[in-house]
């Protein structure tokens, strides 16, 4: 019985830990409803290629919350990174700060380009 209880508790912990993650989509998106495209990777990653017109807002930058303060919290934003993880983290921070517009997780650069129809700008 103890082993069963440990499995149940571990499963519940995993479910609650993953519940805050924001999934990214592979379905095409109507970009007309988004105010801005935000790349939350590092400047070095951004320099290797980014969506045309994307604004760099490094989620790992200590000033990330201050950068978010320059945005309209009621607007819709399309957010992407390298894998979808950091864009999900950025979205969670934005929600915690009171952002009420649609916050779309574009996932990785290639997926974000595919679903948005925006070209990747290469160096």
Where are these predicted regions, by residue range?
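Active-site flanking residues adjacent to catalytic metal/cofactor-binding acidic residues
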Residues: 38
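Short, surface-exposed ligand- or partner-binding patches at beta-edge/loop junctions that are enriched
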Residues: 80
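Rhodanese-like catalytic fold shared by cysteine-dependent sulfurtransferases
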Residues: 2-10, 16-35, 43-75, 85-123
């Amino acid at each position: 019985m103890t082993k069963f209880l440990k499995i149940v508790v571990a499963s519940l912990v995993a479910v609650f830990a993953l519940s805050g993650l924001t999934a990214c989509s592979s379905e095409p998106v109507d970009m007309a409803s988004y105010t801005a495209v935000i790349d939350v990777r590092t400047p070095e990653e951004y320099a290797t290629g980014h969506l045309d017109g994307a604004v760099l807002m490094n989620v790992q930058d200590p000033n990330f919350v201050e950068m978010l303060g320059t945005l309209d919290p009621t607007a819709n934003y399309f957010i992407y990174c390298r894998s979808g993880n950091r864009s999900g983290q950025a979205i969670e921070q934005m929600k915690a700060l009171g952002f009420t517009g649609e916050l779309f997780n574009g996932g990785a650069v290639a997926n974000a380009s595919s679903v948005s129809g925006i070209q990747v700008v290469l160096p």
